[in-house]
Amino acid sequence: MGLGLRGWGRPLLTVATALMLPVKPPAGSWGAQIIGGHEVTPHSRPYMASVRFGGQHHCGGFLLRARWVVSAAHCFSHRDLRTGLVVLGAHVLSTAEPTQQVFGIDALTTHPDYHPMTHANDICLLRLNGSAVLGPAVGLLRPPGRRARPPTAGTRCRVAGWGFVSDFEELPPGLMEAKVRVLDPDVCNSSWKGHLTLTMLCTRSGDSHRRGFCSADSGGPLVCRNRAHGLVSFSGLWCGDPKTPDVYTQVSAFVAWIWDVVRRSSPQPGPLPGTTRPPGEAA
């Protein structure tokens, strides 16, 4: 997902092109594939959600509570929610696995300050039309605490998704994941010509290899220290290119808003958020 003056380019535009051409990207193409990663052990990331439109995987997300999924706001631009589905408990999306649970989208809450042209505040909450049954293949992922700071430069994290695994639209065998490191925000902002905001977070591969995301991975979580610290938002033309670092929505900046939405929409009492470690979550 590249930046541009209108949509910040096609999801995968070069920095030069993205900052010069007012091209709006096709919906859902921002932040598309896991590049330089590996297939995870099936169902070892039970919090992962696949958002589908027209029977096709469109974006990722993570399960916050049994009826709530967190994703990226740009994934739902010009989309009819009545045709959307959320799949939990999946590893291979092309297979009807017995672990999968499929839900419709009951409601969408986009951050009120989301800006589609710059991807500022690129976050939303999906309320499912039913409650997920938690177990080994379907589990919760916690966001940072209300007073948590974003991870510092050099912190090791991971990002997963079902997007293409090459620049040539090669489909993955199952859920893929890449290990990345948090990049200094000033360095990242310089790479993006000063167009980033304080509520964005960047990563790099940490070595000489191209590693990261590109497009149908949008909305998926960046997991650092077993917390969802980022949401896939946008990148450059070439996946994992250090010249255009991967950019995420910084979840710690929106924790109060997240729980306020859940509380206002779920008046019934429930357990305090983040009191249970997600099943199958590895460090």
Curated annotation (Swiss-Prot):
Disulfide bonds join C59-C75, C157-C224, C188-C202, C214-C239. The keyword Signal applies. It comes from Homo sapiens (Human). The gene is PRSS57. SMART domains: Tryp_SPc. Detected in peripheral blood neutrophil granulocytes, but not in other types of leukocytes. Detected in neutrophils and neutrophil precursors in bone marrow (at protein level). Detected in myeloblasts and promyelocytes in bone marrow. Keywords: Disulfide bond, Glycoprotein, Heparin-binding, Hydrolase, Protease, Secreted, Serine protease, Signal. This is Serine protease 57. After cleavage of the signal peptide, the N-terminus is probably further processed by CTSC. Processing by CTSC is probably required for accumulation in cytoplasmic granules; in the absence of CTSC the protein does not accumulate. N-glycosylated.
